[in-house]
């Protein structure tokens, strides 16, 4: 592939920021409901672990028998006896399902459109949430978590892709970071509901709530148009012009001109009868094996994998259990506070990401995470609760300002527009593999090494900071592939 000068997604003037329209806000919010589902389900097993697995009994009302509750009356067990390894498998198989969903999501999105693939993912999320709610065995929980992982794996590809395609370049960083904000909102929602439902009678309602979010997302998509970039790439030019006109503050003629600029930048002017395969981008296998994709592929692999290998999901998956060893009476409350902090700092990052840039935030984020991982290790090893909680809060804040929002945002910015869906799938698959490895191995490593396991995360974060400094280009405000990769 010749690295010719082509416009990146939403290329345009960088002089002033255009106004944000109501349809742009609506489209971003609806797309982000998919990320909220991802965040919700990735953390839903954190708080109720001991109650679900029969390790702890806590009745919300001593005067009411479990058999008198709705779930008890309908034959649902009070708990499902699980070993730590079985619970680890249920937690981590979410990542395997997510890997499958992400693997196919790019091709599905290219073929059927961003909107309808996202709606299908939400439908699967609704069904799998209900399956988890009604589960009475280890195998049922495994199957439900695999399915919900598939749906979330699809959603986490579509959300940043759709936002990147509808946002003006001047707002790309701020709006793209809403993906991570939404993931954190999903995690916060789980922790909020856990304050009420994390007990021996009500833990199933935490699993049921995911279906409510899924139904809301399906209905909300009915109010949003398909991505204009997908429409124009498949020959639906008039529909693309109408959709873009709603997203932009200017006139219909200006929207039409932007569509024509897109077509010229890609060297085609398609009609509806054209083969949709011609400009659908590479397959995932082509992307992985073709040497012409080596530069963006390598950086995407490093960023999306190290986001997990720096240890964030050791807190998201197992934070209640880890902190509970030192603060058993306050572990759920501490995790709730962590979730609030994650949302607040990510929102703050979204306000500065287009001013500061991607590289400085990634460097600051990983450097602080390195130091805090070491302090978490010390706090756990020496049972110093104040040090553990403080270091954990700073660690989460550091993640939220850089390594949280930037990886999924930067994939599209590092890629040609026609490669973006496949690159998004590739990066997300890498992220899922890393998530599975951390989710499965962390409880084993923590059992063998105790707090010293966080020293491993510190070493990885330090190496990744060095890699960012040497290999990751800045993408802030850049509109062409060659401009992004100049000097690399």
Curated annotation (Swiss-Prot):
Cited Pfam families: Sugar_tr (PF00083)
KW Transmembrane (keyword) present: yes
Topology, Vacuolar side: 40-87, 143-146, 199-204, 321-322, 365-390, 443-446
Region (Disordered): 258-281
InterPro entries (UniProt xref): GLUT (IPR045263), MFS_dom (IPR020846), MFS_sugar_transport-like (IPR005828), MFS_trans_sf (IPR036259), Sugar/inositol_transpt (IPR003663), Sugar_transporter_CS (IPR005829)
Keywords: Glycoprotein, Membrane, Repeat, Transmembrane, Transmembrane helix, Transport, Vacuole
Localization per Swiss-Prot or TrEMBL: Vacuole membrane
Glycosylation sites: 63
Record-stated family: Belongs to the major facilitator superfamily. Sugar transporter (TC 2.A.1.1) family.
Identification of the protein by name: Probable metabolite transport protein YBR241C
Annotated source species: Saccharomyces cerevisiae (strain ATCC 204508 / S288c)
Native organism taxonomy: Eukaryota, Fungi, Dikarya, Ascomycota, Saccharomycotina
